[in-house]
Amino acid sequence: MNKAPLLLLLFCLLGCQKDKQRPEQKIFDRILFVYHLKESVEANTWTTFDDPQYDVPLIYFTDSSSYVANPTEKFLKTFKSELVLEDGTIKIYKTQKRVDDSPFHMETGMTLGDPTPEFNYHSPFMMCSSFEETVKTIPDVGSTDEWTTMIIHEYFHGFQYKHKPYMDYYENEIVQVQPDSLTTFYKKLPWFKQSIDAENQLLLDAIAEKDSIQTKRLIQAFWDKRKQRRWQFQQKHKFSLDKFEKCYETMEGTARYVEFSLYKDFANRKPDESLLKSDSSFKSFAKFKNYNLQKDKWLYLTDKTTYFYATGFNMARLLDKLGIEYKSRLFKDGKISLEDILREKY
């Protein structure tokens, strides 16, 4: 008997079996990589980010299925699920049916208001579409590497919401006015936009300024400009937007700050061995080599993004430059904001 054809057939069968396993292995490796990134963020950028008390479950959506990492008991009672991987403290389940029919997810979601039987009532869940589904909605996302930075941004919102004082403040005082309202003011009111763009430039100038006296003058000019805009808005519209702007600026600015921290981390990070084997969309952080913030204007310019993302991001960077501690205070006291902490010192 000729053994060569049999060996070739066996090799092909093993290869086919590996191909069948690969899609699910890729999912597991991606989820595990995200959890390892949380550890990196805690070590390098935001202490307590990976603390178990602030963890939120992750729901990963393909086009036809859902996987959930570390779900709550309520989730498992709501959705029939099978444990498909256990790795240390991480348990990944596959739901029998897709959790919902939405074609795209990249958000931390929860249900607020009157009590409901919903699985995520007062219980935030990070929900993300797979890389393959994400690029259908956001074509500019070029790799699994970039996709994971978006997930960590949203995961940080879960971290914020897991602080009960912050959750209570957000639900009782803020959620009634959604971020889209502030965005509309920026887009529809030229004077409002002009002032915000100028405020943001003052923050950028203060970050870049080396002279401490001039830095203080720039910060005071920022306060004067902001105070005038808010007063003018209240006079014209009979509505104070101060607390909403401060809250969303802190919420989104710090999430962007954490996302940005990964760009710097990826510049020197070694490729993940598991993803190299299972995920052809993993590009070994190639985009982030020799990373330069100035090229990503959408991170820090108000006219390139939702404005309070940029002002919040820049305010966090200014606090870093000034050596003012803020990370241990935010979210533990529900209403305290980046602006409040900067005002205490300047």
Predicted segments with their positions:
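Short consensus segments that form the blades of beta-propeller domains
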Residues: 139-140, 238, 306
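Active-site scaffold of zinc-dependent metalloenzymes
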Residues: 83-142
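Post-HExxH zinc-binding segment in Zn-dependent metallohydrolases
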Residues: 162-234, 241, 245-271, 275, ...
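N-terminal mature-domain "stem" immediately C-terminal to a signal peptide or N-terminal signal-anchor/transmembrane
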Residues: 19-97, 255
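Membrane-interface helix-loop-helix junctions at boundaries between adjacent transmembrane segments
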Residues: 139-147, 170
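Bacterial Sec-dependent N-terminal signal peptides
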Residues: 1-24
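Active-site-proximal alpha-helical
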Residues: 241-268, 282-344
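Active-site recognition of the HExxH zinc-binding catalytic motif
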Residues: 149-162
